[in-house]
């Protein structure tokens, strides 16, 4: 009986790991004002194409600020006024990856950027 319980517990742990949602951002760096950066967010653990995705950011000492969002198909995009015309959100559903192209960067764009489901 002990063995059986251990086996069930192990299966439960493995199932939990398999279903875990992971969002891993990359692409940040130092850039001068007026420069460009492209952020990427690799997603796993869910059906990526079924969900709208967003980018949010947190400037030093400030709260979270929504930056941009994109529909599951990629057909609709939305932007905060502060980044409109400078940032472009996109996604590649075949790669389960979300992108944020940031151009004409300003000092006030300095922040930690997060992707969100």
Swiss-Prot record:
<dbReference type="GO" id="GO:0005886">
    <property type="term" value="C:plasma membrane"/>
</dbReference>
<dbReference type="GO" id="GO:0003823">
    <property type="term" value="F:antigen binding"/>
</dbReference>
<comment type="subunit">
    <text>Immunoglobulins are composed of two identical heavy chains and two identical light chains; disulfide-linked.</text>
</comment>
<dbReference type="InterPro" id="IPR007110">
    <property type="entry name" value="Ig-like_dom"/>
</dbReference>
<feature type="region of interest" description="Complementarity-determining-2">
    <location>
        <begin position="70"/>
        <end position="77"/>
    </location>
</feature>
<dbReference type="GO" id="GO:0006955">
    <property type="term" value="P:immune response"/>
</dbReference>
<dbReference type="InterPro" id="IPR036179">
    <property type="entry name" value="Ig-like_dom_sf"/>
</dbReference>
<dbReference type="InterPro" id="IPR013783">
    <property type="entry name" value="Ig-like_fold"/>
</dbReference>
<dbReference type="GO" id="GO:0019814">
    <property type="term" value="C:immunoglobulin complex"/>
</dbReference>
<comment type="function">
    <text>V region of the variable domain of immunoglobulin heavy chains that participates in the antigen recognition. Immunoglobulins, also known as antibodies, are membrane-bound or secreted glycoproteins produced by B lymphocytes. In the recognition phase of humoral immunity, the membrane-bound immunoglobulins serve as receptors which, upon binding of a specific antigen, trigger the clonal expansion and differentiation of B lymphocytes into immunoglobulins-secreting plasma cells.</text>
</comment>
<feature type="domain" description="Ig-like">
    <location>
        <begin position="20"/>
        <end position="117"/>
    </location>
</feature>
<protein>
    <recommendedName>
        <fullName>Immunoglobulin heavy variable 3-23</fullName>
    </recommendedName>
</protein>
<feature type="signal peptide">
    <location>
        <begin position="1"/>
        <end position="19"/>
    </location>
</feature>
<dbReference type="Pfam" id="PF07686">
    <property type="entry name" value="V-set"/>
</dbReference>
<keyword id="KW-0732">Signal</keyword>
<dbReference type="InterPro" id="IPR050199">
    <property type="entry name" value="IgHV"/>
</dbReference>
<keyword id="KW-1280">Immunoglobulin</keyword>
<dbReference type="GO" id="GO:0005615">
    <property type="term" value="C:extracellular space"/>
</dbReference>
<dbReference type="GO" id="GO:0016064">
    <property type="term" value="P:immunoglobulin mediated immune response"/>
</dbReference>
<dbReference type="GO" id="GO:0070062">
    <property type="term" value="C:extracellular exosome"/>
</dbReference>
<dbReference type="GO" id="GO:0072562">
    <property type="term" value="C:blood microparticle"/>
</dbReference>
<feature type="disulfide bond">
    <location>
        <begin position="41"/>
        <end position="115"/>
    </location>
</feature>
<dbReference type="GO" id="GO:0005576">
    <property type="term" value="C:extracellular region"/>
</dbReference>
<keyword id="KW-0964">Secreted</keyword>
<keyword id="KW-1003">Cell membrane</keyword>
<feature type="region of interest" description="Framework-2">
    <location>
        <begin position="53"/>
        <end position="69"/>
    </location>
</feature>
<feature type="region of interest" description="Complementarity-determining-1">
    <location>
        <begin position="45"/>
        <end position="52"/>
    </location>
</feature>
<keyword id="KW-0391">Immunity</keyword>
<keyword id="KW-1064">Adaptive immunity</keyword>
<keyword id="KW-0472">Membrane</keyword>
<dbReference type="InterPro" id="IPR013106">
    <property type="entry name" value="Ig_V-set"/>
</dbReference>
<feature type="region of interest" description="Complementarity-determining-3">
    <location>
        <begin position="116"/>
        <end position="117"/>
    </location>
</feature>
<keyword id="KW-1015">Disulfide bond</keyword>
<feature type="region of interest" description="Framework-3">
    <location>
        <begin position="78"/>
        <end position="115"/>
    </location>
</feature>
<feature type="region of interest" description="Framework-1">
    <location>
        <begin position="20"/>
        <end position="44"/>
    </location>
</feature>
<keyword id="KW-0393">Immunoglobulin domain</keyword>
């Amino acid at each position: 009986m002990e063995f059986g319980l251990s086996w069930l517990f192990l299966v439960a742990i493995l199932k939990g790991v398999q279903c875990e949602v992971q969002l891993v951002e990359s692409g940040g760096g130092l850039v001068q004002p007026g420069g460009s950066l492209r952020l990427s967010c690799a997603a796993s653990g869910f059906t990526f194409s079924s969900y709208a995705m967003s980018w949010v950011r947190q400037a030093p000492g400030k709260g979270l600020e929504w930056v941009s969002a994109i529909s599951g198909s990629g057909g609709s995009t939305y932007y905060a006024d502060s980044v409109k015309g400078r940032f472009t959100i996109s996604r590649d559903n075949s790669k389960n990856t979300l992108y944020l192209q940031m151009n004409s960067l300003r000092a006030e764009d300095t922040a930690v950027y997060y992707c969100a489901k």
